[in-house]
Amino acid sequence: MAASLVGKKIVFVTGNAKKLEEVIQILGDKFPCTLVAQKIDLPEYQGEPDEISIQKCQEAARQVQGPVLVEDTCLCFNALGGLPGPYIKWFLQKLKPEGLYQLLAGFEDKSAYALCTFALSTGDPSQPVLLFRGKTPGQIVMPRGSRDFGWDPCFQPDGYEQTYAEMPKAEKNTISHRFRALFKLQEYFGVTDGAGDH
């Protein structure tokens, strides 16, 4: 499947300009396909993260009638059995980063993990959707740093004193869940030389 996509345009399903910018920055100029952002209204699927990613990708490929890349991000609180998980977008809209932190007020365990899944389809419904996952463990903390990128202010990756929002973008882009998932996508296309050395 990788060979059939080389040199082609892949629609990256997002309406978020910051997300597109981050993905392109992480993939770098050796990535053999051109990503073109397109906002597509997809149903809000429910289920486990992999199921949601596959369903979203299949529906996006059906609408685009060609190759698509869909990203799904989860923020999973261990004390809450993995919630909010794939529903983080809705929790964040209602609660803001402060509310996410307050959700864990009654729990000693503030550990969490950020999970990013990229789902890739050639656009051919007979071909399986491929999944590329990245996971970063961390803690949910009182929000700190810039407020321009989702829940970044309240997620502090393990081994760091800063939240994602406080980190320079270049540093975040070498440790984040999104970076780890995109690294696997790069490996699939055989273009990782040096990508993991940042």
Curated annotation (Swiss-Prot):
Record: residues binding ITP: 14-19, 56, 72-73, 89, 149-152, 172, 177-178
EC number(s) per entry: 3.6.1.66
UniProt binding sites for Mg(2+): E44
One GO MF term attached to the UniProt entry: ITP diphosphatase activity
Compartment(s) where it occurs, according to its Swiss-Prot or TrEMBL record: Cytoplasm
Enzymatic reactions: ITP + H2O = IMP + diphosphate + H(+); dITP + H2O = dIMP + diphosphate + H(+); XTP + H2O = XMP + diphosphate + H(+); N(6)-hydroxy-dATP + H2O = N(6)-hydroxy-dAMP + diphosphate + H(+)
Cofactor(s) this protein cannot do without: Mg(2+); Mn(2+)
Modified residue annotations for Phosphoserine: S146
Modified residues (N-acetylalanine): A2
UniProt KW Nucleotide-binding keyword: yes
InterPro entries the record matches: ITPase (IPR027502), ITPase-like_fam (IPR029001), RdgB/HAM1 (IPR002637)
Details of cofactor binding: Binds 1 divalent metal cation per subunit; can use either Mg(2+) or Mn(2+).
Cellular component aspect of the GO annotation: cytoplasm
Record keywords: Acetylation, Cytoplasm, Hydrolase, Magnesium, Manganese, Metal-binding, Nucleotide metabolism, Nucleotide-binding, Phosphoprotein
A single BP term in Gene Ontology: chromosome organization
Xref: HAMAP family: HAM1_NTPase (MF_03148)
Family: Belongs to the HAM1 NTPase family.
Reported function: Pyrophosphatase that hydrolyzes the non-canonical purine nucleotides inosine triphosphate (ITP), deoxyinosine triphosphate (dITP) as well as 2'-deoxy-N-6-hydroxylaminopurine triphosphate (dHAPTP) and xanthosine 5'-triphosphate (XTP) to their respective monophosphate derivatives. The enzyme does not distinguish between the deoxy- and ribose forms. Probably excludes non-canonical purines from RNA and DNA precursor pools, thus preventing their incorporation into RNA and DNA and avoiding chromosomal lesions.
Subunit-structure text: Homodimer.
Name by which UniProt lists this protein: Inosine triphosphate pyrophosphatase
Gene assigned in the entry: Itpa
